[in-house]
């Protein structure tokens, strides 16, 4: 085989270096950008720990596999026969033997290095397994079978499995390498009837096979612990009767056989033949089939299944206890009460309920995003999330009230075609503007047939225009970090010292960012880095990027928290809150496991999927342990990320605090103002309510029979016109209500539960968000000897009521579309009250929903009215709705469009001074538009200043201010 010239070798090496540089360059660039970002949020130790954990684990695993392969190739090559007989002139191995001999160093080192790199890249992804093992924390609970602390299964066993699996890989790769080498160099010959195996080949391969079988013995030993997560029985997770009485002893038997089989392979070194290890291997295989598979199957078929309710009672009892503990639905967290479920109440009993009735929420956060968009924003580059949020605030009189809340965020996807320049997207339209809230229990005025007004939220706005001094005051209403921002929505803020502001703030003013968020762009090197990272040369040539410039990226609050805490699963619905005058995004973080012994395996994504839109879906991964251990906040102005421990007893959180010390702040650092806005998280509640449909049962026999199981009902309003949709679960709803045992209304997350495969209501569950009893779950269990209608039955009843079917304003009207809002189920005076708002949306461009009617159902009676009070009185009688909170606020003009202030008196016209002031405003506006189109920030700042001065002169002359 011809050799390459020195020049060819150099060119080949240079080409390889360039190729590697191109492949690794983007990764190195991304790593440096991440390093800068972690420095911005003050969490570089998180980045460093991940990098060194991955690097260390990858190098160790790669070196282990590579060295084992290298050693075996070297042994096989050094022990090759001196004289190798050939089968003839056309011997196919001769050519390979020649190449391998001439390139022995290339193959001897190159193949192990390549395999080592592949192994290292694969193994590094298990860095979390290593870190949890190194920082294992005891649970203080033991499993019922072996008596091991739960931490053995959650933190230690996965690491032993990791070591075992890579040992298998190393031995297998070494065996294959040795086998091929011996075959090529004549240590193994297939000629003749039985072939020939040289002594060195027999010894080396026997040792490797013996080590492999010895590892299999260890595998059988560890399998015993894995049985505590068995899924043999579809009803529950955990070791079944068959697992305990058949597979458990079988694993020990197979382990012993595997040890003898390994000894047989080692004995082959001295016995000079492979017959004994071959027989031992056959024995191991037959034993694994007969004893490991056939015997358990026979026991299961003929002993367990005919008596399953008795045989599996112990396992079910263990599963019940473990599941309740792992998912936080034990007696210490869940209170189950029998609830009468009355079907008849007097008007006085309803009116006396001053905790729930006055606070019934009429605004649906899943419906009103378009209404918020059209009525509270003036420009196309602002937007709201598809799903609004529900939170609570105290009125000046101390009364707690729930609100629909949202941030008016920047939405670069909404920019018009002539606004799509790079400068506009990344340097002008950099931030949102305002915290928007609306009391959830009322509208501006009642909707009247034939009118265009009424049925709109009563907006309370804190934005730049009013200096953040709305009903809920905000120190700085500018929003630089929000849910509508994706990976490509970076913003460049700041600039050259003394330069005019360029960031759009209002039509009258521009702004220069003054917060601590962002990565400095002052150095040419950083500009070069980001130019390469985003593939954008403007970073290098735009003169507005100066020494004080900074770049903001990773601006989605959920993404920011995920990077800071990669070990957390995050709730899909971040929400904004005003805390001490600052706008904070609050995100719930979960610690999860999938290896808690005997605890029920649950698909996280499936359990949290419902008809809710506008939220992040959870990955459909199995979990059997979950805790809401962390609450995270992201400042909407400066992007700072703070994590707080809210379940400091959680062993998983403690382990991760050992990995990343100081990243999660202790609970004592949570301010009372922040704690007042903590909500019980939706995704955790969805998982828990799903499990409570089964795990409210305490008796193994009842659990096995399923006869008292419940289920989450399908959302009766998911089709938009009512109608059940069996594929979608009804979401839980946040409400402000007072249930039995509470002395005042509290903010809580609630859900109705129906009987299994039935539509009648079986239970109602709520989770408290009140700081005094946060996290406590209450289940109101309805009597089984009566039939209380469930959500779908009530929805059908509501829609078939003559008052509804005969209403041509809302239904069967080609000019409008009726939208059924969330169907709330509320405990009131011993019964269950259903309330559902109905919205209409005109079939016109730029139309938006408005509240038109309220449906109420109780005890088979339906109320249908423009107001909640009217609907209650239709059901219960006069006086029942006197405490309902949906009457228009005092002094509200029912004909005034929402979100607007009453018009002030127009200034006198005709004076020369006024005429000149108006002309100056028009001239200044033209200057602003011209400067925006040109992208000249100096001109833009001067134009804004000119406009501001013209407006001030106009106001001084008696004009209306903005």
UniProtKB/Swiss-Prot annotation:
Determine if Transmembrane is one of this entry's keywords: yes
Please indicate if the UniProt record lists Transmembrane as a keyword.
yes
Q: Where is this region: Disordered?
A: 707-730, 876-916
Pull one GO CC term from this UniProt entry: plasma membrane
| Annotated transmembrane regions | 10-30, 55-75, 106-126, 168-188, 203-223, 250-270, 279-299
Enumerate composition-biased segments (Pro residues).
Answer: 899-910
Per the UniProt record, the source organism is Saccharopolyspora erythraea (strain ATCC 11635 / DSM 40517 / JCM 4748 / NBRC 13426 / NCIMB 8594 / NRRL 2338)
Q: What is this protein called?
A: UPF0182 protein SACE_1102
Tell me what topology the record assigns in the membrane: Multi-pass membrane protein
Family annotation (Pfam families):
UPF0182
Report the family membership.
Belongs to the UPF0182 family.
Superkingdom classification of source: Bacteria
Q: Where in the cell is it found?
A: Cell membrane
Listed A to Z, the keywords are: Cell membrane, Membrane, Transmembrane, Transmembrane helix
